[in-house]
Amino acid sequence: MLCCLVFKGLLSMDLLRFLLISPFALIKGLYRLSAYLLRLVGRLLRPVVGNLNWRAPQWMTKTANGLHCAFNRSEQWVAKHPKGISAAIVLLMAAASAAFYGYHWYLNRPQPIEPAPMVYQETSIRVSAPRTVNYQAQKPEAQPLSLNFMHSAAPITAMGQVVDQGISLTPAIEGEWKWATERTLVFTPKKAWPMGANYQITIDTEKLLAPQIKLNQTELNFTTPAFAYQLEKAEYYQDPQEAQKRSTIFHVQFNAPVDVASFEKQILLGLVEGKSKSEKKLNFSVVYDEKKLNAWIHSQPLMPMDKGGSVHLSINKGVNASVAATPTTQAQNKWVSVPNLYSLAVNSINATLVESDNNNGERALIIAISDAVKDKEIKNAVKAWLLPQHNFQAKESAKTSTDFYPWDMDDIDDNLLQQSTPLALTLNEAEQEYQPIFSFKFDAPSYRTLLIEVNNSLTSVGGYKMPEKIYQIVRVPDYPKTLRFMSQGSLLSMQGDKQISVAARNMTGMKLDIKRVIPSQLQHIVSFKSSEYSSAHFNRLSDEYFTEHFQYQTALNNDNPGEINYQGVDLSRYLANNPSARRGVFLLTLSAWDPEKRDNQQHSEEDYDEDQEWVGDSRFVVITDLGIITKQSQDRSRDVFVQSIHSGLPAADAKVSVVAKNGVVLLSQITDSKGHVHFPALDAFKNERQPVMFLVEKEGDVSFLPTRATYDRNLDFSRFDIDGEETPSDPRTLSSYLFSDRGVYRPGDRFNIGLITRTANWATALDGVPLRAEIRDPRDTLMSTLPITLDSSGFNELSYTTGENSPTGEWNVYLYLVGKNNETSMLLGHTTVNVKEFEPDRLKVQLQLTPERQQGWVKPQELQANINVQNLFGTPAQERRVTSRLILRPMYPSFAPFPDYLFYENRHNSDGFETELEEQTTDLQGMATIPLDLKSYADATYQLQLLSEAFEAGGGRSVAATARVLVSPYDSLVGVKADGDLSYINRDAVRKLNIIAVDPSLNKIALPDLSLSLIEQKYISVLTKQDSGVYKYQSRLKEQLVSEQPLQISPTGTDFTLVTQQPGDFILVVKDSQGQVLNRISYTVAGNANLTRSLDRNTELKLKLNQAEYLQGEEIEIAINAPYAGSGLITIEKDKVYSWQWFHSDTTSSVQRIRIPPAMEGNGYINVQFVRDVNSDEIFMSPLSYGVMPFKISTKARQAAIELASPSVIKPGEVLPIKVTTDSPQRVVVFAVDEGILQVARYRLKDPLDYFFRKRELSVQSAQILDLILPEFSKLMALTSAPGGDAGEGLDLHLNPFKRKQDKPVAYWSGITEVNGETTFNYPIPDYFNGKIRVMAISATPDRIGKVQTSTTVRDNFILTPNVPAMVAPGDEFDVTVGVSNNLQGLKGKAVDITVRLTPPPQLEVVGEAQHSLSLAEKRETLVSFRLRARSALGDAPLVFDASYGSQSSRRTVSTSVRPAMPFRTQSVMGRMEGNKHTVTNLRQMFDNYAQRQATASHSPLVLTQGLARYLADYPYYSSEQIVSRSIPLIMQSKHPEMDSALNQNEVRDQLKNMLRILSSRQNSTGAIGLWHASPTPDPFVTPYVVQFLLEAKSAGYSLPNDILEGANNALRLLAARPYDDLYSLRLRAFAVYLLTLQGEITTNTLASVQSTLQQLYPDSWQTDLSAIYLASSYRLLKMDDEANKLLQPTWKQLGKAYSKAWWTQNYFDPLVQDATRLYLITRHFPEKVSSIPPQALENMVLALRDEHYTTYSSAMSILALESYTSQVAAQQDTPETLQIIEISKSKGIDPNVISTLNGLFVQGDFTGEAKAIQFNNYASAPAWYVVNQSGYDLQPPKDAISNGLEISRSYTDEQGKPVTQVTLGQKVNVHLKIRANAKQGQNNLAIVDLLPGGFEVVQQTAPEPEFYDNQDDQDEETGSGWQSPLMVSGSSWYPDYSDIREDRVIIYGSASTDVKEFIYQIKSTNTGRFVVPPAYGEAMYDRNVQALSVGKGHILVVPPEAK
């Protein structure tokens, strides 16, 4: 046995030795093999390279021997010690394995998730070098250097600031670096840059740029612009006055003032003659401009040269500037050619056509010469020959009368000249004796050829000659051809001459193709003809199917083809002879006709010549005497009116038919004596019976009007006031009027809404009608739904109480009519109320400008401004500070009563002015005069606006008023109105002006002794001195007087006819006797006349009613001013035609009357259509003029009789009796409100009747054919010699919990009460109120509504009006003023001693005296001031003011808020204890108020939920996800008493009920729930999360409404089946399937669908996604355990791993959500695996919670997961000593204090503010978790800014943009909030909280009213469209989603970007003092890691006005 063991040992030893030596043997084998291979290669190469004898160097031999020996010794040593070597190898392998495992563990250790990692931006810089200084300016300024960064690079606090570190210039230069924008850094030097210098910029990135910016280069170079010049224009100059003076001029332009000496030193000027190569030196002189920036080099005078030449300018390098610069480095050259003696040439010869004064064309020959020649010489030098028409030598050329041979210069010889005819040329008069262009008149046949000779005898003004004669061929152009119908229109009167007028030019004949329409086929005209009535074009069907064809041909006189030929064609011959069917409907086509050609030849030529432009016209014409007007009512019925075109009278007994497409007569009626018939709606007729026209027939006469609106026959009323609401088509239609009791409310107030409902006809019973009211906040979140049932009166009310944390802004109240089964609803009415922080006004301000002119103007010396300031308690506001701002905006006068008149002002200055006027103080009557001092401004017309503010006594709050007036220095103004367009008037057209004069009150006045000058504007050549010192002719616009005549303007105005006989640009100038220009009218006369007599003058019908409002049945008088005499139709219309009246007027002005129907209510429209009389000469205007004028019908018949009475004056604390008296049973609501509140709200008590009878639109559509009437041919021809012209949710965290207690608003609402006779309502007046109360009442009966108001003044013996800041911060020192008013009676003017005392609260201390004595007479007031300092105690601080005199006393208590200058923050520190002791240090130092300091520990991880629950409870936002997450801890209380919050179970149920109500309001029709409100496309995550919560709440024992869960389940089914395939959507689909399965639904198919999609699209990643565990849980619920366990495995493996890197998405899911959801689902559905859950799973969650990386959703999921885990794992029951919490004090000598020991599951205790650290002791073996919660306000602001993912900066400037640290009391300050995201998470869903300094209030940007009126009934409220922040002022670049305005802070919601966004708003100082500036705070609502906090910058000082 022993031998065997020894043998085995030896064997194993040998094996071990063999294994160890094997590597050595392997190495030796490889060495020998490589040696053998090398020898083999040598043998193979020996035959090629021969024998090589090489000996290794000595060092190599020694090295090889050494390595060989070492190798052998190693081999022997290993063979000797096999065991030691083996052990060492094993140890090395173990160490390597350990190192590898450690490295892997290090990589996969739990790593903290980086909060909002900063995104670094690699940016580049573009250097914008300074530009050259503009030395042309009066004060040249140094140009800045700009660095433009690609990204937003400036530190957010440095924008707009001067930079003093981080950047430098080399060489150094004095100046200033400043961030102009976030991307632009600008350097502005003190002096101009040296020109041409090189600079280097060095940048220190850390000091200069934002931390997220990285630069790719830190050194930049640039060069300043070098001194340089340019050789500009060079010319050969000839003196226009002395032609023999010639020289060359070179223009040199410099970019800086040139040094004259150095410049002239470098100039060389030489002359080269002909082709010579040598230069002759020329003398020169130089002319400079004033600034030495331009130089002109003049050569010596030059003589004419036979061969010409050139002048050469050379400027050498070395030219210097007179400023710091380097000299030029390059020479420059320029040449100017000198012409030779024989260089005169003819540039062009052309023949053209011009219009003569008599509309006829003339031919002209235009000759252009290269230099000016004398007119007499050119007259003799030019000759012309008319060459023959045919070339008889060319046999092949055609020789007919229409053929013209194309002669050219090669054909010209003596023989041809002998056959040619000399042509007479007449030289047109020349403007100057010498000129280069001339024109000659000539007369020659068209298309012929001229030969023009220009003799070489010409000598130019410069002495140059032509070398030889010039000959040129010129073609004679033909006159343009014209053939058109005259005038516009289609109707010829059957009783007129029936001639259609034609205008022709250059035509030998015309052909009129006449197609007469068969009457029975008229419907085809309407169906197939173009929709333009006058058009003869057919779209589809040929007109041959329904017409009879005729032709008319006639020759035209074309002896003078340039003249216009007028022709009339009598159409009466083509009428049928049958008097009962005249057939007067024609399609006319006008075309050219040649009398010399046969018809068939003309047809063939026309067909062949397709490219020739067609000359002709076409027209659709109806010969009829029947004019038609139709009016379509809102119910689609029609009223048809028929009128005689000839007489203008209504056509009685005419048959009116409605004709269908197929020609069938659908309806037919006979007109009555007023020419009227009525048809019902025609919509019932369809298809072939569709109506197409109204056909009117009478005694063989036929007319028609299409029924389609697509025709051009509808009248356009858009220029008239016809807008309004649509009249309901159903008389039973309901509408409601909603009104509030005061319009503005503080958060927490209750608002009352009255609702009055009526039907459209006021006749339908309202009893029992169900309505629904909805109240929505400014974010459109539904806050309440109230059912309402109407009674017979239709008068109801509702109330709603807002919360202290309700969002501020405009709330909306909607009233709906509920449909069947509540499925549909119709909006009946709507109103808005404003919820905001406000203080009631105490003053009433009236600003008056005298003399008062609502229209017109006031002369500056007459204008006075007075302000009246009264206390609202009825006494004058004495010694009140008044500030005023005067704004003058220049404007040309224009006045509403004269809208079409142009007034003129000879203005020389168009600058506006804005200035602060001197402050004033009111006198004993509360009055003050404001000096305007308008004398210092230029005489011009201005719009003056005066904005005045009256301040409260000693305070900064004010009440503003504005007034406006037009200011002009003139006694009268002259206005001019044209009857047509003045910019283009045809020659010889008639254009008239109406000239009026008005005084400042806009009364028309007479203005005698005026003159009217006609001036023509022409461009003429004027000899002008140039900058170079020489003279030249230049074209200048010159005004030349044409004529002048006296003018007298009458009181009614004067008409004047413009001169239009000559074309050109003219000005008509009206002057007074002193030559002052009163008006200038420019007009242009075109060269062509109105050949076709088209309509070119406006037709305007002016209507004026005698009243604005009428009683029912009253007669209306209409003053009608028409452009011509004629006949018309007046109708009263609205939704239908109510009545009508025909009239005739022989003059242009008349007064007509029509009566309103007795049953008509609301409003109506007077509609007048007026037709020109057939004998009128105004044929160049439209024959139809029309106008519409609205009128109002009195609501007196609907007014209920109600009276209201209240005492005029009472005292505070008394009861206000309000007596209401009615004449019948009425439902009445009485409400009384502080006038100061109503003044803030600008509340107007409107009359509900004005709403129900509001203006309705004109919905009647009018169509007609009367504007198509053609003038008679005889009338047209009679006027051709003088053709006419024309006329022409609670945000608790961001609210102030230390809010001061404010006095309740003085407002009373009685509720709706039945009153029949007399009833008294009593309202107890609060004892703190002094002021004016407006008392109002609204009453209603089924058929009447009443409105009445009065007022009562409340006034005590002593009235104290303290001015206290809304809030202050500890350390603030400020002044409080008290206005004291003595209202004691019977003092007889004697002053009495009154003691005023201030009792401060504990939070404040008085600095100085707390009591003052003053002497005050009756009805006088004065001011008392106290200085206070805020202590560190926080909260509401009531100040008590007492005033006493003898037995009389008065007390007033007003509170301020002492609140920290820091925002409220919650911080939770949590984690798992390492070992049995853990200490938490760095505790926050907080104010004790509202501070919560709590420490908790437990052996169960459920303790971590304590911190999460606190975080959720304090969370300030209310999206659907957030309110659901906040409710998760509440529903856990019933299961775990340790999680008790401050709410009991009843309060929890109430809170859950409110939350479910909000969720229900956000649920859409499919059941899906929106994030903020119901949306058709909601966030898909929200609905499944809400369902998960509902199921948890249900399992916790809370009852739920079934409808919300059922609806949400329906949305889940849609979500589960949604075909989206991205991973996020698939995760949500799996979530939805899980929730449906959890409720018992069989979801196998849907599960399989989701799983297969995941497997197909995401095979590598889906199994570890949350979608996998949702599917696994679903399969487990369906008892499919195998599939469930299979899907669980990949997720289970993930539980033990930590994340190697952080990740975040915006879709709610983060690493903590992943861990919590996995733990939650495994513990819920796989309980058997709970005991084996790896500790790393909990560790990952603890890590995220410890580092505060959680959101609302991840917090809620963590609570659910830990609760489920704790329920599955029984907690270890330990003794109390096993777990302790100890407080370690920061005070020395105090021993650590045990504040709590284990009690049940948790150990929990509160620690004090004296704690330095909290220590947790765990004496048990089980692990423990701890939580430390700290919530409150920090004592000190941070020293450094915080910018985690977001940057924020806040600065204060004055209104001019200058930074401020000291402001004047009442001054407005601009607050600039800048934000920028420096991480992706910091870009969305941000909340910015900006705390105001004490003593300031927010200014909301609402313009003050022009004036405050006592009688406010008719004042309309302005309504805006769309939400915009009421804070934002101009200059802001950030447009937030919403802003919440609180008393002490502004909260702004929106998004940021990586660029700086700026929001600017205003605050206003209200109290003097020294106030702490709080920091601005920002955070992301959905990512608590993203936070930003600016540094609070010291204090801001507010001083009295006189101390500034």
UniProtKB/Swiss-Prot annotation:
Keywords: Signal
Name of the protein described by the UniProt record: Alpha-2-macroglobulin homolog
A Pfam cross-reference name: bMG10
Entry keyword annotation includes DNA repair: no
InterPro entries: A2M_N_BRD, Alpha_2_Macroglob_MG3, Bact_A2M_MG5, Bact_A2M_MG6, Bact_MG10, Macroglobln_a2, MG2, Terpenoid_cyclase/PrenylTrfase
Recorded GO MF terms: endopeptidase inhibitor activity
Family: Belongs to the protease inhibitor I39 (alpha-2-macroglobulin) family. Bacterial alpha-2-macroglobulin subfamily.
Domain of life: Bacteria
Signal peptide: 1-27
Membrane spanning residue stretches: none
